[in-house]
Amino acid sequence: VAAHVSPLTDHLKDPVGIAARLIDTPYLWGGRTAFGIDCSGLVQLSHAICGNALPRDSDMQRTGVGELIGEGADHPALKRGDLVFWKGHVAMMEDEATMLHASGHTMSVVREPYADATKRIGHLYGLPLAYRRP
């Protein structure tokens, strides 16, 4: 049997690793495939491949996924897998300083320093609204 084949019941365990495989995928509002994906689709698909059902849209993810760990400028040290929410946007932390997201700025899935992204996104949408740990 080929090494890349596994039973349908097997699930991968790392949504961040799945999201990283989608770097350079084109941005497509409403998309959730490797042909085009948006920010909440990236989070939903990455978790679905790992066997975790998440809501489709970022506003529903912001209120219904995991544990709320902070709001606005108030948050603990961010960890791999934490979700960061702005109005109409979500990103997934790859580590404490880097995030993965489907960016309308680059029109693709990118790896970006959290500090740089927060500054750039903040000019349009302000501080993140919430931080959640799935």
Where are these regions (language model features)?
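Structural motif
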Residues: 81-82
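Aromatic- and glycine-rich peptidoglycan recognition patches
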Residues: 2-7, 32, 68-72, 94-134
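Residues forming anionic-ligand binding surfaces in small-molecule and nucleic-acid pockets
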Residues: 20
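A conserved glycine-rich beta-strand in the N-terminal activation segment of trypsin-fold
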Residues: 90-91
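A generic structural signal for residues embedded in beta-strands
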Residues: 85-86
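Catalytic cysteine-centered active-site loop
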Residues: 27-78
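Boundary regions of SH3-family modules and the immediately adjacent low-complexity/disordered segments
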Residues: 1-17, 25
